[in-house]
Amino acid sequence: MVKEKEYYERLGVKPDCTEDELKKAYRKMAVKYHPDKNQGPGKDAAEAKFKDISEAYEVLSDPEKRKMYDSYGSEGMKESGFHASSAEDLFSHFFGAGGGGGGFSFGGGGGDDFGGFSFGNMGGMGGMGGMGGGHKKRRKGEDIEHEMNRSLEELYNGKLVKISISRDEVCKTCKGSGSNKPGVTTTCPTCNGSRYVFQKKQVGPGMIQQVQTACHTCHGTGEKIKEEDKCKECKGKRVIQGKKIVQFQVEKGTRDGERIMLQGQGSEYPGVPPGDVIITIREKPNVNFKRNGDNLIYTKRLKLLDSIAGSQFIINTLDQRKLWVNHEKGDIIKQGDMRYIENEGMPIKGTSRKGKLIIAFDIEYPSNLTNDDIEKLSKILPKAATPSVSKSDCKSVGLSKVNFNTNEQSSHGGAGGAYQQHGGAYGHQKQQQQGFNPADFGAQFGGGGPQQAQQCQQQ
């Protein structure tokens, strides 16, 4: 059983797919989304897709990386030090560009899966072991990936954001040549001009990962300059570290994990366009609302009388408005019940509409009642059911309160521990300590999956 399926889904294959099925899926999708084939309005989206499928194929085509991904998922890959290679380098290696003549080009159409793509004389495709095959020219500078935490209020209202990034910039002293003298470069002896070397890294018991990194001798250029000939400013690296302020708009309705691409704002390299800056948005938790797709879930605590006799209350929205909510008399609300308000949820990106504001009710019962109160209630509320067997045929037992604030344990693990282990019902005492969590019930409003919807229907 694999931990997650995202990489498989990017390529449209199943987790038990064969190596040939992986290659076929990557070949078809890489050609479809290659930047050279997508120059129209959807260029940015196609380029992001191209990078996603390349990252997925790089991992799944390597048996060691695939084994690690299946066991630990993408987070485990990150923790092991994995960084995706250039999508263009992977594409070039796969289709044989730079490996021994031939190459590839994009035509104007074609009726097959490859849409006019010409493979030419590619030679052998080979495996992913060495990424060799001679010097591969960069298509552009390196991309810079950045994760950014944004509040739910900002994702609701939208926000213009400015950040400072560190990036490589072409050295102005040597104009990116790495030397102040012409014609002094030679092929790097360490990487043989390929710009990359591979290092083995132990990431777990009996697990060795082969990590591709930029050559430490030539700093990923594929060329070597004698020490005495190197530019004094960049030390022969052709680029220096610089800072750049970038600005972008977080659109209303942006979701957790969504990526924003700032084209041409990434690292520079001589003779090629700059790379991109890719911002991944992470949603910070909110104390009042929980997001469920396009819906917002708000927990409202009601006293027992209000849940029966009706009530009015205020909800402060994420854009500083106030909603006067009228709960009509006769609409009896039970513990765990939900109601919703149309068009008061999260903005739906690209539209003027919003999702639903779902109100999940947590009913507050009185902590104690007098005999007089009980007598009055017994005249109004339905009578309790009488057991159908004789008391003399049963063992008579009483009830004791469970205290969730203590660490007392019985020989069977303690009532509180058992309650928390098995989930329990949403009892009043547990709610006071932890609060009602309605996240599992959002599916019926369009925010969750089939399992969540089934749970909601069973309430």
From Swiss-Prot:
Lipid attachment points (S-farnesyl cysteine): 456
PTM Cysteine methyl ester: list the residues: 456
Instruction: Enumerate the spans annotated as J domain.
Output: 6-73
Q: Which CDD domains match?
A: DnaJ, DnaJ_C, DnaJ_zf
Region Disordered, as annotated, extends over: 405-459
Protein origin, superkingdom: Eukaryota
Q: Which GO terms describe its molecular function?
A: ATP binding; Hsp70 protein binding; protein-folding chaperone binding; unfolded protein binding; zinc ion binding
This protein's membrane topology, according to the annotation, is:
Lipid-anchor
Q: Which stretches does UniProt call biased (Low complexity)?
A: 418-435
Q: Which GO terms describe its cellular component?
A: cytoplasm; cytosol; endoplasmic reticulum; membrane; mitochondrion; nucleus; perinuclear region of cytoplasm
Which residues are part of the propeptide segment? 457-459
Q: Which keywords fit this entry according to its UniProt record?
A: Chaperone, Cytoplasm, Endoplasmic reticulum, Lipoprotein, Membrane, Metal-binding, Methylation, Microsome, Mitochondrion, Nucleus, Prenylation, Repeat, Zinc, Zinc-finger
Q: Where does Zn(2+) 1 bind?
A: 171, 174, 231, 234
One Gene Ontology term of the biological-process aspect is: protein refolding
| ZnF bounds (CR-type) | 158-243
Q: Where are the CXXCXGXG motif repeats?
A: 171-178, 188-195, 215-222, 231-238
Binding residues for Zn(2+) 2: 188, 191, 215, 218
Zinc-finger found in the keyword field? yes
Subcellular location field: Membrane; Cytoplasm; Microsome; Mitochondrion
Q: What does this protein do?
A: Co-chaperone for Hsp70 family members. Plays a role in protein transport into mitochondria and in the regulation of apoptosis via its role as co-chaperone.
Protein name (record): DnaJ homolog subfamily A member 1 homolog
Species for this entry = Dictyostelium discoideum (Social amoeba)
Question: Lineage in the entry?
Answer: Eukaryota, Amoebozoa, Evosea, Eumycetozoa, Dictyostelia
